[in-house]
Amino acid sequence: MNQDTICAIATAQGGAIGCIRVSGLDAIEITSRIFTPARKGKKLKDAKPYTLTFGHIHEEENIIDEVLVSLFRAPHSYTGEDSTEIMCHGSSYILQKVLQLLIGNGCRLAAPGEYTQRAFLGGKMDLSQAEAVADLIAST
């Protein structure tokens, strides 16, 4: 399986809230480079899985957005890899800026269907489930 850490916008355009998923070996580390929890002394890597951490996405000293970040540890995630989900404001500018920051810190943009491919290859779903996800995506 590919060991790259990938990222992609997971929500439709035009919504009030957007979600960016990050998955791979370095997902938590890369997300931590651009995310600072609001609670002083708290670190994303120490957060409990399946919880939300409130904080800020930043570029150097500049705050880009207030966000919630959820943490999923391997193998208990959609892909079976360490993963984070960044819930931010849904404007195109914010979503693209967060993607650029993730890519600049070591992620690469996910190919269409790559999250599902990783889930299938990681034994998280069978072929019929993967095909159903592909059909659902193609129908929109």
Segments and roles (model prediction):
Residues 1-140:
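A glycine-rich (often HGG/GG-containing) alpha/beta subdomain
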